[in-house]
Each structure stands twice: as structure tokens, then as C-alpha cells.
Amino acid sequence: MYGKDGTSLIGTGNVAYFLTTDMLSYSDAQALKGKGAAAITTALGSAYSFTNTEAGKFTVALADAVDVKTLGIADNTDYTAYLMVFDSTGITESSSFYLTATKDLSTYDGTNSAQVKWGTQSTASKAAGAWNSVAAPEPTSGLLLLLGMAGLALRRRCA
């Protein structure tokens, strides 16, 4: 997870919750400001309890969290779900806690929880100031490099 400047790494042990409004309302999530991670565990219930023991050291701070209204959502009822991400290694800065919401879950891929697809990308992109992305190399480039090296080795052996 990166800080607000987009370059400073502020943690390596992130915990993320994909929550619908019937699990925990956005307003209730904001009410957890200043409370420990145990308060989130209690609010979410045993089904969403932490597995990382370091999470208990983290104090929730929502001062810099992305508010629903800044995402272009009219009010705290005009959304379907939201994503709660925070650092679990004991960092207590408010920049270690992020909240973002989405209006539409029509494209959510429920069969693969590792790839959450937001219904409207604009809601997530408006929180881009706090996130940083890293370009991943194309897998075929490595394969082509290996094939080229193998071909070169064969030519040398034949010569």
C-alpha cells in the first residue's frame, strides 16, 4: 500500500474487505474512526474476523478516507458495496486506511473473489491519488527471450 504521495510504501501486510451494505453500512464503517481493529472484527461478526495477529495493533483512522460523496455518489444509501483496505502491520497513520464505494455490482465476478470487478470504474478511479500501480511485464516477452537464447545455443553447438 502506498501513501498519499503515491510513491512512499507505508505497509506490506494489507487486509481488504469487500462489503455489501447488508454486512456493514458505510456510515457504520466511518463510525469506527479511532477504534482498534478489534472493533471492526466485532462489527463485521465472526465470519469476517482477522487472521493476521498484527491487525489488532492497527488503530482505524478515517480522516483521509475517501468519502462516498467525493466519489460522486449522492448520499450514503446510493451505493451497493464498498471496499475497505488497511495496513495490518500496526501502522496507525490515517493514510493507511482507505474506503471506496461502487454503485453497480452488475459486472462483479462472484466466482473469483481475487478479481473484484467494479460496476463503474469511475468510482474507484476518483480515489487514485492514494493508490499506485506497477506495470507488469507481458508474459510472452519472457518466453520469446528464452526461445531466442535456445536458438542461439543451438547455432553455437552446430557451428
Model-derived regions, located:
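Mature extracellular "passenger" or substrate-interacting domains of secreted, surface-exposed proteins
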Residues: 1-135
